[in-house]
Amino acid sequence: MSDTRAFLLFHVSAYPKAELSDLFKALYQSAFGCEHLVADASAAEAYIASEAAHARPHAGEIVEPLDGPYVRVHLDILKKGLSAQTLARLFALSAEHRAQTEFEKKLAVLTGMVRQGELPFDASECERAVSAWRAAGFPPCHHSETFRQAYAPAYRLMKAEYAPLLPLLCELDGRLAQGRRTTLAIDGPCGSGKTTLAALLAQLYDCPVFHADDFFLRPEQRTPERFAQPGGNLDRERLREEVLLPLHEGKPVCYRRFDCHSLTLQP
């Protein structure tokens, strides 16, 4: 649950030269996410790479939370190994959504704080600016020139749920940039997000996903001795022969899935 008041106080503290339009932009991004849909991912990737090459180093945290389900990721993240391609794809996957009611609530908090003197802006000016913006249908707004000169913002938005994955993605991109073949095993308890993470990686890297469910033990393998072994509930021999060895040798992978209903291997 967001705390708009705390967010705005933190924002003006982190960016003391921010103007009213910069707070408008932060709240807009908090509610609506990416301002534009990405029609051409390759063009977005090239633009990110070019912008990052000329960007001023960012003094604060690379990942900056907003007041909602989005974060700003500053382009310094590319110096930590993340590729422009991966960042562009994360940006594209974080498509704009319309949370109009939540946005209006955030604006009401902003205007109330200005009225109470909690934010360093003129109350009448704030009311007029909000009214004019609302009458125009709340189009995307830009950072003020003062903000640009002071902070040289260079970032992209992404869903906040992707932010904890950035260290992993930086590591993967670093390996791939070196031309290293990479096989990633994802482990965790039931409901921990393994399938969700695997699906995201498949979207980001156009890579195959091999599910452990396809390698459950066949009935004849289910013995007390087998279940007493670490990882004994997995047909690791078949996983090794049909998937891991071909991957290691750079060969095509063709494997049989285990059917949990018939308890047999599919052809």
Language-model-detected regions and their locations in the chain:
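Short hydrophobic/aromatic beta-strand immediately N-terminal to the Walker A/P-loop
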Residues: 183-185
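Conserved nucleotide-sensing/catalytic segment adjacent to the nucleotide-binding pocket
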Residues: 208-211, 216-266
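N-terminal pre-Walker A segment at the start of P-loop NTPase domains
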Residues: 151-176
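Active-site signature of alpha/beta-hydrolase-fold catalytic machinery across serine-
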Residues: 200, 204
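Long, basic/Gly/Ser/Thr-rich N-terminal segments
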Residues: 1-147
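Conserved lysine of the Walker
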Residues: 194
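Hydrophobic positions on the alpha1 helix immediately C-terminal to the Walker A/P-loop
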Residues: 197
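P-loop (Walker A) phosphate-binding loop of NTP-binding proteins
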Residues: 189
